[in-house]
UniProtKB/Swiss-Prot annotation:
Keyword Chloroplast among UniProt keywords: no
Naturally occurring in which organism (per UniProt): Macrolepiota procera (Parasol mushroom)
GO molecular function: cysteine-type endopeptidase inhibitor activity
Domain of life: Eukaryota
Protein name per UniProt: Macrocypin-1a
Function: Inhibits papain and cysteine cathepsin endopeptidases, and also inhibits cathepsins B and H, which exhibit both exopeptidase and endopeptidase activities.
Family under the similarity heading: Belongs to the protease inhibitor I85 family.
UniProt KW Nucleus keyword: no
Signal sequence region: none
Assigned keywords, A-Z: Protease inhibitor, Thiol protease inhibitor
CDD domains tied to this protein: beta-trefoil_Ricin_Macrocypin
Outcome when changing residue 25 to A: 20-fold lower inhibition
Amino acid sequence: MGFEDGFYTILHLAEGQHPNSKIPGGMYASSKDGKDVPVTAEPLGPQSKIRWWIARDPQAGDDMYTITEFRIDNSIPGQWSRSPVETEVPVYLYDRIKAEETGYTCAWRIQPADHGADGVYHIVGNVRIGSTDWADLREEYGEPQVYMKPVPVIPNVYIPRWFILGYEE
């Protein structure tokens, strides 16, 4: 199932956490500092003004998307970008030109999680032999940051999950 281009909120699901769109709370992807900074997360509800434009990127392949922040004032700080070679590094919010200059890439594979819950997805970065790099959340310098986590492709290993919900004005 693919995404329609549109505005969404992106909620990190901790291991064992189940999504509930009726109860605000949890760690929502944000970028309170603007562009060229790591993507962070804040404990905000779905009524938050943080919104992400998720759009197909057919040139990058099937189920590949860009994730771009739009602010209330309609400014666009940038897109989720990741290193094409490094793992366990923060996901940055770069504009496309900056991403191309640094060698970082902007497309992500967003695929349904196998937990049977609607709206629960994996956000996948680099794919290498024997492992895949997944977007996850960790505490870094006193604040939660989105980062790339290598997870071996073996049974019963926890894979980071995100609840992606259509943004409502």
